[in-house]
Amino acid sequence: MKLAIKLAYRNLIGAGLRTWLNVIVLSFSFVVIIWMKGIMVGWDHQAKTDMKNWEIGGGQYWQENYDPFDPFTLSESHAAIPVSLNDEITNGEIVPSLIVSGTIYPQGRMQSVAIVGMNPHQSIFMLPTEKLDTTTSAIPAIIGSVSSRNLKLNVGDYVTIRWRNVNGMFDATEVVITGIFSCNVPSVDVGKIYIPLEKLREMMSLKGEATILTFREEQSERPEITGWSYKNTATLTQSVDELIQTKTVGQSIFYAILLLLAMLAIFDTQVLSIFRRQKEIGTYIALGYTRREVVGLFTVEGAMHSILAAIVSAIYGLPFLIWMAKSGWTMPIEASEFGMAMAQTLYPVYSAGLVISTVLIIVLVTTVVSYWPSRKIAKMNPTEALRGKLQ
Amino acid sequence: MENTSIIKIEHLTKSFPMGKSKFTALKGINLTFGEGEFAGLVGPSGSGKTTLLNIVGSLDVPSSGEAKVLGESIGSLTAKGAARLRKEKLGFIFQSYNLLAVHNVFENVEFPLLLLKYTAAERKKMVMEALDWVGLTDKVKSKPPQLSGGECQRVAIARAMVKKPSIVLADEPTANLDAANSHNILQTMVKLNEELKTTFLFATHDEKVINYLRRKIFLKDGNVDQDEISTN
């Protein structure tokens, strides 16, 4: 094997441009695949981190009727906060929020919103709720930058909101925008307006009630509480996993095409080599190689393209991948319209496992592709090979 | 000098399929070669000389009869056994040199020693010695495309001789060379034959080579027509 590697290396280096063209194509596959996989891992990591920071914290209790995908359930999705959680709420380890369905009237237009009551002093979410802790002539409210753009509302603007209280009566009031935040989690921004929790409870006549209770720290397990259902972070980020999985499948097709192109070049080189190097094959046999050993040599030679490609990838790919990890990849589309937590700039994350598995897969595929045409050598007649007479 | 029998061929027949029929290249050959012989299979194209050389070189097997080389029956050798025989005991010289084009002179000559697992220091010493025999010590870094035909064939001789094999099989070694280079090559081979007691077996129809042979076996249509031993 050592000899095969030594000879294969000599043969590859000696083959010059042909080798380097294959190596460059293959190294391109290495870099692109690692980069794209890194983007997916980075996206997954960033999406989950953003969701934890902005929306789900370390897990939540949902009032049992709450369904974020059905706004009609909101009128029934509230209950008194269980007494057993009072201490944690007082310590700031749990943040209660109340969500009700409402309507907003910016510049005379009407738009449905979810009105979220939030404690202005909470510190679990990155929401700038301290901007709700202000004295104004109207109720202070904060909105996300996408909502601000869609509703054409800026800081200092007054706008009417309307809601239906627990008695089924419609009521309306004015809010003033005291803050606009920028956030990568669309469900935190789009269609939501945040006002002080106590104010909303007052408006709804729902004293001491909440829809969601969010923990600061990741909770492995919480006791069952009647009327509330516990959701851990894995459950709450399941949609991210599913979407990433869907994207990964799509990307795998792209990897396959990339690899296929690189493998086609290797396969073609192997077929051509075996045809053009018949005399050399015959010579190896005459000098004491068995045909099997020559098959091994040609397979190692083909597979070595991937080793050289990994080295070449490291030379030009490493600085590129490091640069991408630092400066990120700015999405060519408006990230807020993507439907899931996604930053405008994604920062790829490369783990050792990702790099090693990609290298191993490519080396393995290259070896198989190199072996495939080399099997022909095992059927060669060495006396004809020596004269280069095989067709 | 030629006393111990190292190649023994008995009733050797070799046939090749040709469509639905068979072509018999060798028809019941009986020959014996001793150690240190400088012999040649002589004959026109199609006489069976290369076929016989290939069988002696364990690159091919007889259809019937027996070819024993250094005590090993070629017909019953496994692929590994035949490869071992070639690797350890046989050297080959080809008409078109068959040098490894991407390897330099040193690496080409070193190749058989790599297979025999000599150390780097041993290989270097042996390669330089072999290149000294053929007068190419100044070309170690050159690659075959940078060499003349004569130089290529001298590299091929050095490669065949570097491991000091018992038998060197040379198939039309001067066919691609001019007269001056042919004589130069042949003189080198004669010198090595005399100094190292290596048996040389040629397949040739080149007069220049025939004149150097001490034993000439004339083949005609797969049969031994004449077996001449020179007295000089």
Set out the residue ranges of the language-model regions.
Chain A
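Alpha-helical transmembrane segments
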Residues: 31-61, 321-328
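Transmembrane alpha-helical interface segments in multi-pass membrane proteins
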Residues: 280-325, 357
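Hydrophobic secondary-structure segments that place a key small or acidic residue at a functional site
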Residues: 97-100, 111-119, 130-197
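N-terminal Sec/SRP start-transfer signal
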Residues: 1-34, 44, 53, 388-391
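Mechanotransmission and gating elements of multispan inner-membrane complexes involved in transport
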Residues: 165-252, 258
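Membrane-proximal extracellular/periplasmic loop immediately following the first transmembrane helix
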Residues: 49-101, 114
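Short helix-loop junctions at transmembrane helix boundaries
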Residues: 311-358, 371
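Hydrophobic alpha-helical transmembrane segments of multi-pass inner-membrane transport and secretion
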Residues: 16-41, 245-282, 303-316, 361-368
